[in-house]
Amino acid sequence: MSHSHTYLEPAPRPDFKEVFATRLHQAREAAGLTLRGLAEALDGQVSHTALNKYEKGLMAPDSRLLITLAKVLSCPVDQFFRPLRPSLGAIRFRKKSSLRELARKAAEARAQDHVERYIELEELLALAPAYSAPINRPCQSFADAEDAARQVRQTWQLGHGPLPNVLELLEERGVKVIRIDADEKFDGCSAWLDQHPVIVLASHLDRNIPKLRFTALHELGHLVLGIAEDHPDEEKLCHRFAAAMLWPQEQVYQSLGRQRQNVMWPELVSIKREYGISLAAALYRLKDLAILPESKYRWLQIQYKQQGWHRNEPGSYAGEEAGLRFDQLLMRALAEEKITLSKAAALAHEPLEALRHRLALPGPASTATEDAQP
């Protein structure tokens, strides 16, 4: 009896037109352009109808057009030839987000592009980062969200004190943290790529570190809490989880007591300094835990708004937030000669000289002997 049916033909490699079609579509969306917008940016060299045909894989471009497209879309030419990979699963954007469709698509395309480069870098180094879910039960109530934060801290052995570097903490535990330039209305989103949990954060959050920390943990909530898709309080549950991760209940009681009639702003400023949580989130936490009466919370919130603190809060948090894993892997791949400097620049999606400067790498002319001289 023949067993020939057990041998599978290798999957056909996608042809250039198909790869180019996907990559052009991705690069256009990442640039925040419609087909007509790209046609205009190309000064009418190519019509939007022709661009549509390229994106459908019906036509292949010549080298002149490739170079022009790369320039207009601010991406290296070889990005159009990069092998296709699985797409990010359903990306969880904030419900009721006021993000325009074009800006949302741009954020998705940039995230997809970045995570593909990240995974390619890991594969070059033969690394498979282990991620295991820190909790394994559905979250249905605010009490569940508090418990979940407690359990995540316990499973990840984080103790009860302030979390020093949230982004590094997530990366050390197998969560890919991706930073993208995005619309000011976009803070973050989360998704899965195969078994890889991915958190995407806007680079404008660097101007507000407590908000960056809170957003990262809010997105972790979407990944680990197992909230039903149609749960009406999904966003609030993730908020509660993030606040409990930053400032655990026991620490709140220890710092400010279990019952208060009022709280002074300097008290919250010192909490912000220690725990890296914003005044707004700390105040909300006191309401959540029923430490402050609802009426007092509302009065303090009015004060907060009147002072203009929703635009610029008093108090600062000096802790550092940096997800350095991608750059560390890039330097490791360079040191082990797994990649050339130009490949590193393509993976980092930045010009070669900019990468050389950012990572403080020696220039092409420098040699060990030159470096050794005083």
Residue spans for each PLM region:
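Active-site hotspot residues in diverse enzymes, especially metal/ion-binding acidic/histidine motifs
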Residues: 1-374
